[in-house]
């Protein structure tokens, strides 16, 4: 099967597996008790202000696993909820994640939560300004998750796109509920000649999912 078809099938599988709701997805993507404990603690601490929902987290994990991603990048790690879901998927593929968080307090929480979840061997936390740190990273990525300042989405995309592998996935969060805050980012990815882009909404917040086809 062609590699682009494998990636499209991975996306379809992720949508189906998560689309059945939380109970269905829990049955299909179980977490170890240690990690579930950390996720629950983050949810309680953030008091309903999670960077991503549980449904979105499960979607990320399933998409990582089914696309067989190996080198992932997250911009906007917050306190680690999404990084842990991504890390669980990467543990299944043998991959690694670099996650960036600007706020020093949240970056510290992010590192602590990743450690408590037992994912320090998979997830590397980079605190500080992502615009400054991105040029210092080596290599390319086959999975990118963007959940940072919405007004800067286009700029982040332009920085990362040259390092996105062919058939790699670029995901951006909040494209439904905060669409008016991200300027013309969606126009760029929807009309880009080298991307196939769709919008999914596991939880109502929405994600754009773009695959590099050239």
Where are the predicted features?
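Hydrophobic alpha-helical segments of integral membrane proteins
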Residues: 13-18
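A short alpha-helical cap/connector motif
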Residues: 4, 8-9, 20-145, 150-171, ...
């Amino acid at each position: 099967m062609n590699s682009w078809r494998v990636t499209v099938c991975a996306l379809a599988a992720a949508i189906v597996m998560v689309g059945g709701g939380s109970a269905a997805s829990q049955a299909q993507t179980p977490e170890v008790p240690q990690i579930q404990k950390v996720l629950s603690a983050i949810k309680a601490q953030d008091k309903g202000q999670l960077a991503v929902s549980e449904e979105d987290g499960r979607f990320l994990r399933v998409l990582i696993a089914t696309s067989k991603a190996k080198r992932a990048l997250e911009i906007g790690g917050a306190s680690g909820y999404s990084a842990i879901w991504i890390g669980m998927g990467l543990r299944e593929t043998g991959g690694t994640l670099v996650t960036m968080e600007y706020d020093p307090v949240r970056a510290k929480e992010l590192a602590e939560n990743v450690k408590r979840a037992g994912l320090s061997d998979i997830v590397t936390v980079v605190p500080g300004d992502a615009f400054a740190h991105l040029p210092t990273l080596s290599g390319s990525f086959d999975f990118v998750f963007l959940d940072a300042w919405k007004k800067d989405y286009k700029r982040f995309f332009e920085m990362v796109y040259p390092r996105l592998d062919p058939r790699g996935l670029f995901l951006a969060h909040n494209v439904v509920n905060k669409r008016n805050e991200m300027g013309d980012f969606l126009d760029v990815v929807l009309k880009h000649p080298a991307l196939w882009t769709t919008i999914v909404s596991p939880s109502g917040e929405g994600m754009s999912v773009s695959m590099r086809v050239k």
